[in-house]
A protein has these predicted regions:
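TPR/Sel1-like alpha-solenoid repeat signature
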Residues: 71, 78, 90, 107-118, ...
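A short, Lys/Arg-rich alpha-helix, primarily the initiator
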Residues: 1-9
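Short alpha-helical DNA-recognition segment
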Residues: 10-30
Length: 351
Protein backbone atom coordinates (compact mmCIF):
# COMPACT_ATOMS: atom_id res chain seq x y z
CA UNK A 1 0.00 0.00 0.00
CA UNK A 2 2.83 2.42 0.85
CA UNK A 3 4.63 1.60 -2.40
CA UNK A 4 1.45 2.28 -4.38
CA UNK A 5 0.80 5.53 -2.51
CA UNK A 6 4.33 6.84 -3.12
CA UNK A 7 4.14 5.78 -6.78
CA UNK A 8 0.87 7.68 -7.23
CA UNK A 9 2.32 10.76 -5.51
CA UNK A 10 5.14 10.75 -8.07
CA UNK A 11 2.72 10.14 -10.98
CA UNK A 12 4.57 6.94 -11.90
CA UNK A 13 2.97 4.01 -13.71
CA UNK A 14 3.73 0.40 -12.80
CA UNK A 15 5.91 0.28 -15.90
CA UNK A 16 7.82 3.44 -14.87
CA UNK A 17 8.61 1.96 -11.47
CA UNK A 18 9.44 -1.50 -12.80
CA UNK A 19 12.01 -0.20 -15.28
CA UNK A 20 14.34 -2.96 -16.37
CA UNK A 21 14.65 -4.40 -12.85
CA UNK A 22 11.26 -6.14 -12.53
CA UNK A 23 7.98 -6.61 -14.41
CA UNK A 24 4.94 -4.36 -13.83
CA UNK A 25 3.01 -7.48 -12.82
CA UNK A 26 5.47 -8.25 -10.02
CA UNK A 27 5.21 -4.67 -8.78
CA UNK A 28 1.42 -5.04 -8.73
CA UNK A 29 1.71 -8.22 -6.63
CA UNK A 30 3.99 -6.44 -4.14
CA UNK A 31 1.61 -3.45 -3.91
CA UNK A 32 -1.36 -5.71 -3.23
CA UNK A 33 0.53 -7.64 -0.54
CA UNK A 34 0.40 -10.91 -2.46
CA UNK A 35 4.18 -11.05 -2.79
CA UNK A 36 6.92 -10.13 -0.29
CA UNK A 37 9.81 -8.18 -1.84
CA UNK A 38 13.45 -9.09 -1.19
CA UNK A 39 15.76 -6.60 0.52
CA UNK A 40 17.43 -5.88 -2.83
CA UNK A 41 14.07 -5.09 -4.40
CA UNK A 42 13.09 -2.90 -1.43
CA UNK A 43 16.30 -0.91 -1.85
CA UNK A 44 15.60 -0.52 -5.57
CA UNK A 45 12.01 0.62 -4.94
CA UNK A 46 13.03 3.00 -2.13
CA UNK A 47 15.61 4.63 -4.39
CA UNK A 48 13.16 5.09 -7.29
CA UNK A 49 10.41 6.37 -4.97
CA UNK A 50 12.73 8.89 -3.23
CA UNK A 51 12.14 7.32 0.17
CA UNK A 52 13.85 4.89 2.55
CA UNK A 53 13.73 1.15 3.10
CA UNK A 54 12.84 1.86 6.74
CA UNK A 55 9.75 3.79 5.65
CA UNK A 56 8.62 0.98 3.33
CA UNK A 57 9.12 -1.62 6.07
CA UNK A 58 7.38 0.34 8.83
CA UNK A 59 4.20 -1.14 10.23
CA UNK A 60 0.97 0.81 9.86
CA UNK A 61 0.86 1.18 13.65
CA UNK A 62 4.30 2.80 13.75
CA UNK A 63 3.28 5.15 10.98
CA UNK A 64 0.06 5.98 12.82
CA UNK A 65 2.07 6.83 15.97
CA UNK A 66 4.21 9.24 13.94
CA UNK A 67 1.16 10.85 12.36
CA UNK A 68 -0.43 11.26 15.83
CA UNK A 69 2.78 12.78 17.13
CA UNK A 70 2.79 15.29 14.30
CA UNK A 71 -0.81 16.41 14.90
CA UNK A 72 -0.26 16.53 18.68
CA UNK A 73 2.89 18.64 18.36
CA UNK A 74 1.09 21.09 16.10
CA UNK A 75 -1.95 21.17 18.43
CA UNK A 76 0.23 21.83 21.49
CA UNK A 77 2.04 24.64 19.69
CA UNK A 78 -1.32 26.13 18.67
CA UNK A 79 -2.59 25.97 22.27
CA UNK A 80 0.51 27.85 23.41
CA UNK A 81 -0.25 30.36 20.65
CA UNK A 82 -3.95 30.59 21.79
CA UNK A 83 -5.25 29.18 18.50
CA UNK A 84 -7.69 26.82 20.21
CA UNK A 85 -10.00 26.09 17.27
CA UNK A 86 -7.14 24.88 15.07
CA UNK A 87 -5.72 22.94 18.02
CA UNK A 88 -9.02 21.09 18.50
CA UNK A 89 -9.11 20.18 14.81
CA UNK A 90 -5.60 18.71 14.97
CA UNK A 91 -6.44 16.78 18.15
CA UNK A 92 -9.47 15.31 16.34
CA UNK A 93 -7.17 14.15 13.53
CA UNK A 94 -4.87 12.52 16.08
CA UNK A 95 -7.84 10.86 17.83
CA UNK A 96 -8.89 9.26 14.53
CA UNK A 97 -5.56 7.40 14.23
CA UNK A 98 -5.42 6.59 17.96
CA UNK A 99 -8.82 4.92 17.87
CA UNK A 100 -8.18 3.15 14.57
CA UNK A 101 -4.86 1.63 15.73
CA UNK A 102 -5.62 1.47 19.49
CA UNK A 103 -2.67 3.68 20.47
CA UNK A 104 -2.98 3.97 24.26
CA UNK A 105 -0.15 6.40 25.05
CA UNK A 106 -1.07 8.74 22.19
CA UNK A 107 -4.67 8.58 23.39
CA UNK A 108 -3.53 9.81 26.81
CA UNK A 109 -1.72 12.72 25.18
CA UNK A 110 -4.92 13.64 23.35
CA UNK A 111 -6.78 13.66 26.68
CA UNK A 112 -4.11 15.87 28.20
CA UNK A 113 -4.25 18.30 25.27
CA UNK A 114 -8.03 18.48 25.64
CA UNK A 115 -7.43 19.36 29.29
CA UNK A 116 -5.06 22.15 28.22
CA UNK A 117 -7.76 23.59 25.96
CA UNK A 118 -10.32 23.49 28.77
CA UNK A 119 -7.82 25.29 31.02
CA UNK A 120 -7.43 28.03 28.40
CA UNK A 121 -11.23 28.29 28.27
CA UNK A 122 -11.39 28.49 32.10
CA UNK A 123 -13.48 25.29 32.28
CA UNK A 124 -11.63 24.04 35.35
CA UNK A 125 -13.85 21.05 36.16
CA UNK A 126 -13.57 19.58 32.65
CA UNK A 127 -9.81 20.21 32.56
CA UNK A 128 -9.37 18.38 35.88
CA UNK A 129 -11.33 15.36 34.63
CA UNK A 130 -9.30 15.10 31.42
CA UNK A 131 -5.98 15.42 33.27
CA UNK A 132 -6.97 12.71 35.76
CA UNK A 133 -8.00 10.37 32.92
CA UNK A 134 -4.76 11.04 31.05
CA UNK A 135 -2.61 10.44 34.13
CA UNK A 136 -4.07 6.98 34.73
CA UNK A 137 -2.70 5.95 31.32
CA UNK A 138 0.61 7.81 31.80
CA UNK A 139 1.15 5.95 35.10
CA UNK A 140 0.31 2.62 33.45
CA UNK A 141 2.91 3.34 30.73
CA UNK A 142 5.58 4.72 33.12
CA UNK A 143 5.59 8.00 31.19
CA UNK A 144 7.36 9.88 33.98
CA UNK A 145 7.70 13.35 32.46
CA UNK A 146 4.05 13.34 31.42
CA UNK A 147 3.08 12.15 34.93
CA UNK A 148 4.98 15.08 36.47
CA UNK A 149 3.54 17.64 34.08
CA UNK A 150 0.01 16.35 34.71
CA UNK A 151 0.49 16.44 38.49
CA UNK A 152 1.62 20.05 38.15
CA UNK A 153 -1.48 20.89 36.12
CA UNK A 154 -3.72 19.23 38.71
CA UNK A 155 -1.92 21.10 41.48
CA UNK A 156 -2.43 24.43 39.72
CA UNK A 157 -6.12 23.69 39.28
CA UNK A 158 -6.43 22.87 42.98
CA UNK A 159 -4.60 26.10 43.84
CA UNK A 160 -7.18 28.06 41.86
CA UNK A 161 -9.85 26.38 43.97
CA UNK A 162 -7.88 27.32 47.14
CA UNK A 163 -7.42 23.66 48.09
CA UNK A 164 -3.91 24.25 49.39
CA UNK A 165 -3.40 20.89 51.16
CA UNK A 166 -4.47 18.96 48.04
CA UNK A 167 -2.34 21.20 45.82
CA UNK A 168 0.65 20.60 48.07
CA UNK A 169 0.09 16.85 47.76
CA UNK A 170 0.09 17.03 43.95
CA UNK A 171 3.27 19.13 43.86
CA UNK A 172 5.09 16.87 46.35
CA UNK A 173 4.08 13.82 44.28
CA UNK A 174 5.56 15.55 41.23
CA UNK A 175 8.80 16.19 43.14
CA UNK A 176 8.99 12.52 44.23
CA UNK A 177 8.44 11.18 40.70
CA UNK A 178 11.10 13.60 39.41
CA UNK A 179 13.71 12.59 42.00
CA UNK A 180 12.93 8.84 41.94
CA UNK A 181 13.38 8.73 38.17
CA UNK A 182 16.31 11.18 37.94
CA UNK A 183 14.66 13.40 35.34
CA UNK A 184 17.12 15.79 33.70
CA UNK A 185 14.91 18.83 33.20
CA UNK A 186 15.96 21.83 35.29
CA UNK A 187 13.07 24.01 34.16
CA UNK A 188 10.55 21.38 35.21
CA UNK A 189 12.22 20.96 38.61
CA UNK A 190 12.31 24.74 39.07
CA UNK A 191 8.60 24.87 38.35
CA UNK A 192 7.95 22.11 40.92
CA UNK A 193 10.03 23.91 43.57
CA UNK A 194 8.28 27.21 42.91
CA UNK A 195 4.81 25.77 43.33
CA UNK A 196 5.76 23.81 46.45
CA UNK A 197 7.16 27.03 47.94
CA UNK A 198 4.12 29.04 46.91
CA UNK A 199 1.74 26.47 48.42
CA UNK A 200 3.72 26.38 51.68
CA UNK A 201 3.40 30.16 51.77
CA UNK A 202 -0.38 29.89 51.40
CA UNK A 203 -0.37 27.30 54.20
CA UNK A 204 1.67 29.77 56.33
CA UNK A 205 4.57 27.31 56.58
CA UNK A 206 7.06 30.11 56.06
CA UNK A 207 10.25 28.13 56.75
CA UNK A 208 9.53 25.63 53.97
CA UNK A 209 8.18 28.39 51.72
CA UNK A 210 11.54 30.17 51.95
CA UNK A 211 13.48 26.92 51.44
CA UNK A 212 11.66 26.00 48.24
CA UNK A 213 11.63 29.57 46.95
CA UNK A 214 15.43 29.58 47.12
CA UNK A 215 15.58 26.18 45.40
CA UNK A 216 13.32 27.51 42.63
CA UNK A 217 15.35 30.65 42.05
CA UNK A 218 18.49 28.58 41.42
CA UNK A 219 16.79 26.69 38.58
CA UNK A 220 15.43 29.50 36.44
CA UNK A 221 17.30 31.03 33.54
CA UNK A 222 16.08 33.53 31.02
CA UNK A 223 15.07 32.34 27.53
CA UNK A 224 15.01 34.41 24.34
CA UNK A 225 11.66 34.95 22.60
CA UNK A 226 11.46 33.64 19.01
CA UNK A 227 7.84 34.22 18.04
CA UNK A 228 8.34 34.97 14.33
CA UNK A 229 10.76 32.06 13.98
CA UNK A 230 8.22 29.72 15.60
CA UNK A 231 5.43 30.78 13.25
CA UNK A 232 7.63 30.23 10.18
CA UNK A 233 8.52 26.76 11.45
CA UNK A 234 4.82 26.01 11.93
CA UNK A 235 4.16 26.87 8.28
CA UNK A 236 7.10 24.72 7.21
CA UNK A 237 5.83 21.71 9.17
CA UNK A 238 2.36 22.11 7.67
CA UNK A 239 3.88 22.37 4.20
CA UNK A 240 5.78 19.10 4.60
CA UNK A 241 2.65 17.41 5.91
CA UNK A 242 0.64 18.50 2.87
CA UNK A 243 3.40 17.12 0.62
CA UNK A 244 3.14 13.78 2.41
CA UNK A 245 6.69 14.08 3.77
CA UNK A 246 5.85 12.79 7.26
CA UNK A 247 9.49 12.49 8.33
CA UNK A 248 10.21 16.20 7.80
CA UNK A 249 6.73 17.18 8.99
CA UNK A 250 7.41 15.49 12.33
CA UNK A 251 10.94 16.90 12.47
CA UNK A 252 9.76 20.49 12.02
CA UNK A 253 6.69 20.04 14.21
CA UNK A 254 9.04 19.00 17.04
CA UNK A 255 11.23 22.07 16.50
CA UNK A 256 8.12 24.28 16.30
CA UNK A 257 6.81 22.90 19.59
CA UNK A 258 10.20 23.41 21.27
CA UNK A 259 10.33 27.06 20.20
CA UNK A 260 6.72 27.75 21.23
CA UNK A 261 7.50 26.17 24.61
CA UNK A 262 10.49 28.51 24.94
CA UNK A 263 8.25 31.47 24.14
CA UNK A 264 5.70 30.27 26.65
CA UNK A 265 8.47 29.68 29.20
CA UNK A 266 9.68 33.26 28.79
CA UNK A 267 6.26 34.62 29.77
CA UNK A 268 6.09 32.01 32.48
CA UNK A 269 9.58 32.79 33.84
CA UNK A 270 8.68 36.48 34.13
CA UNK A 271 5.52 35.52 36.06
CA UNK A 272 7.47 33.29 38.44
CA UNK A 273 10.27 35.86 38.88
CA UNK A 274 7.64 38.51 39.72
CA UNK A 275 5.93 36.18 42.18
CA UNK A 276 9.23 35.18 43.78
CA UNK A 277 9.89 38.89 44.23
CA UNK A 278 6.57 39.19 46.06
CA UNK A 279 7.33 36.14 48.21
CA UNK A 280 10.71 37.53 49.31
CA UNK A 281 8.97 40.86 50.01
CA UNK A 282 6.67 38.97 52.40
CA UNK A 283 9.73 37.26 53.96
CA UNK A 284 11.22 40.79 54.36
CA UNK A 285 14.28 39.80 52.35
CA UNK A 286 14.25 42.95 50.24
CA UNK A 287 17.60 42.35 48.55
CA UNK A 288 16.43 39.01 47.13
CA UNK A 289 13.05 40.53 46.26
CA UNK A 290 14.70 43.24 44.14
CA UNK A 291 16.80 40.65 42.30
CA UNK A 292 13.71 38.76 41.14
CA UNK A 293 11.58 41.81 40.43
CA UNK A 294 14.34 43.32 38.29
CA UNK A 295 14.62 40.07 36.33
CA UNK A 296 10.85 40.12 35.77
CA UNK A 297 11.04 43.78 34.77
CA UNK A 298 13.76 43.11 32.18
CA UNK A 299 11.89 40.19 30.59
CA UNK A 300 8.57 42.05 30.53
CA UNK A 301 10.17 45.14 29.01
CA UNK A 302 11.79 43.04 26.28
CA UNK A 303 8.57 41.16 25.50
CA UNK A 304 6.29 44.22 25.85
CA UNK A 305 4.26 42.30 28.41
CA UNK A 306 1.27 44.25 29.78
CA UNK A 307 2.05 42.79 33.20
CA UNK A 308 5.15 45.00 33.37
CA UNK A 309 3.08 47.50 35.36
CA UNK A 310 2.53 44.85 38.08
CA UNK A 311 6.28 44.42 38.45
CA UNK A 312 6.90 48.18 38.46
CA UNK A 313 4.24 48.57 41.16
CA UNK A 314 5.88 45.80 43.22
CA UNK A 315 9.25 47.54 42.95
CA UNK A 316 7.61 50.77 44.11
CA UNK A 317 6.08 48.95 47.10
CA UNK A 318 9.51 47.57 48.03
CA UNK A 319 10.93 51.10 48.23
CA UNK A 320 7.91 52.26 50.25
CA UNK A 321 8.50 49.40 52.71
CA UNK A 322 12.16 50.49 52.98
CA UNK A 323 10.96 54.10 53.52
CA UNK A 324 13.12 55.16 50.57
CA UNK A 325 10.95 58.04 49.39
CA UNK A 326 13.18 59.23 46.53
CA UNK A 327 13.49 55.70 45.09
CA UNK A 328 9.75 55.13 45.46
CA UNK A 329 9.07 58.35 43.54
CA UNK A 330 11.51 57.25 40.84
CA UNK A 331 9.72 53.88 40.55
CA UNK A 332 6.37 55.68 40.38
CA UNK A 333 7.73 57.84 37.55
CA UNK A 334 8.62 54.66 35.60
CA UNK A 335 5.01 53.54 35.99
CA UNK A 336 3.70 56.89 34.76
CA UNK A 337 6.16 56.88 31.82
CA UNK A 338 4.88 53.44 30.86
CA UNK A 339 1.29 54.70 30.98
CA UNK A 340 2.17 57.83 28.97
CA UNK A 341 3.55 55.61 26.19
CA UNK A 342 -0.09 54.99 25.28
CA UNK A 343 -0.71 51.83 27.22
CA UNK A 344 -4.37 52.42 28.08
CA UNK A 345 -4.81 48.88 29.37
CA UNK A 346 -1.97 49.46 31.80
CA UNK A 347 -3.54 52.75 32.87
CA UNK A 348 -6.81 51.02 33.79
CA UNK A 349 -4.88 48.23 35.53
CA UNK A 350 -2.77 50.70 37.49
CA UNK A 351 -5.71 52.71 38.79
Amino acid sequence: EKIKRKRKELNMTLKDLAGSRITPGQISLVESGKSNPSMDLLEYLANDLNTTVEYLMESEETQAEKICLFYQNIAEAQILNSDLLQAEQNIDKSIYYCEKYKLEYQGARNLSLRGDIYMEQQDIASAQQFFLSANIIFIKNNSYEEIIETLLKLGKITLKMMGYQSASSYFKQAEKVFIDNQMGNDFLLGEIYYYIGYTYFKLENIENAIKYSYLAKEKFNQINSKNEYANSLLLLADGYNKKGDIKNAIKYSKVTLKVFKEINNLTYVSEIENNLGRLFYEFENMEESFIHLNKAKEIRQNTKDLKLIDTLANICENYIKLKSVSKAKEALKHILDYIEDGNNTALCKYY
